[in-house]
Amino acid sequence: DGDGVELAGDHDFEAPMPTFPFGTHVAVVEVDTDTGRTTLVRHIACDDAGNLLNPLIADGQVHGGIAQGVAQALMEEIVYDEDGIPKTANFADYPVISSAELPSFEIVHMATPTWVNELGAKGVGESGTIGGIPSVYYAIIDAVSHLGVKHIDMPTTAERVWSAIAAARS
């Protein structure tokens, strides 16, 4: 009808510096020393992403990140031939982790608001991947360290774990 009032707003926010989330992850694994097969039994993640705007989405971000980290620690690897051509270029050759290989993750959120923005929020998506990889890797090393194993190349496939155990025993 032409008598309406238009309401428009515009705002730019530029943070004076980036925010930094903090956290820690603990993985519990079982390693079959006869086969090298590793099973992730438990994974606990405590993350401080400041004020969570949507805790359900934050949980999903952390769960997805942990799954990526576990996959990188246990199975993901790009392999090239002698000419530099990828040999793991599709899902038939490149292993992808699924929920069948993963336990239910235990997520704990801390909330230390940042002063950098008015919401007090920090990033949350990367924390699962960043904490997931070393927690799983070092849980495996810890599980076989009594056998003399000090290092295993990633990914820590059953073959690599078994080879490291065999080398330490000889």
Task: State the predicted function of each range.
Residues 1-170:
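C-terminal catalytic domains of large/alpha subunits in multi-subunit enzymes
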